[in-house]
């Protein structure tokens, strides 16, 4: 109910619903709360449909199993969610390489990707990530590689 009321008041595009999901079996996922410590017993894929139908404008989808591991996104989960809803899905949880960011979009079909550990525990930066994704053919806003000395690909200003 709160999602629909918020969507009606502020507009669907302004409502992002965050879902923390844990894999509990083959292609079975459950919604968790309290930073991934408390099971709700709710089927995550059914909940995603409910959220989308209730007026959510975007979904921030976090795989609890992958979060902090740096082993890559749960691409099966992301793909299942993106295939069942017509709203943007932001993939979160598991990025350890720049390639993982690209995979979240190119394989998972996410509209956007989120990451943290890669930037805290490696020499990668958001600037390098944007440049890498652009080289991979992902259209990004705001990349200004020529200002940061990144010569990953030909630049008209370099």
Where are these regions (language model features)?
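C-terminal helical cap(s) of enzyme catalytic domains, especially alpha/beta-barrels
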Residues: 3-10, 102-144
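Glycine/Thr-rich phosphate-binding loops of Rossmann-like dinucleotide-binding domains
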Residues: 25, 69, 123
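Glycine- and other small-residue-rich loops at beta-strand/loop junctions that grip anionic moieties
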Residues: 40, 62, 67-70, 90-94, ...
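Catalytic cores of alpha/beta
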Residues: 1-4, 76-113
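Hydrophobic faces of well-ordered beta-strands that scaffold small-molecule active sites
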Residues: 15-19, 59-61, 89-93, 111-115
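Cysteine-cluster motifs in flexible loop/terminal segments that predominantly coordinate metals
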Residues: 143-158
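Conserved anion-binding
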Residues: 1-61, 65-66
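Charged helix-capping and loop-helix junction motifs
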Residues: 41-45, 71-80
């Amino acid at each position: 109910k709160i999602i629909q009321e918020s969507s009606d008041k502020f507009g669907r595009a302004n409502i992002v619903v965050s879902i923390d999901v844990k894999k509990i079996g083959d292609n079975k996922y459950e919604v968790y709360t309290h930073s991934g410590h408390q099971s709700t017993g709710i089927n995550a894929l059914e909940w995603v449909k409910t959220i989308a139908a209730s007026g959510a404008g975007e979904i921030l989808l976090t795989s609890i199993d992958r979060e902090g591991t740096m082993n890559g996104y749960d691409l099966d989960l992301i793909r299942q969610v993106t295939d069942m809803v017509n709203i943007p899905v932001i993939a979160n949880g598991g990025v350890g390489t720049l390639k993982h960011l690209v995979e979240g979009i190119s394989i998972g079909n996410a509209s956007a990707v989120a990451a943290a550990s890669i930037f805290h525990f490696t020499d990668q930066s958001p600037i390098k990530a944007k440049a890498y994704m652009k080289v991979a053919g992902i259209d990004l806003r705001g990349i200004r590689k020529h200002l940061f000395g990144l010569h990953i690909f030909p630049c008209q200003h370099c």
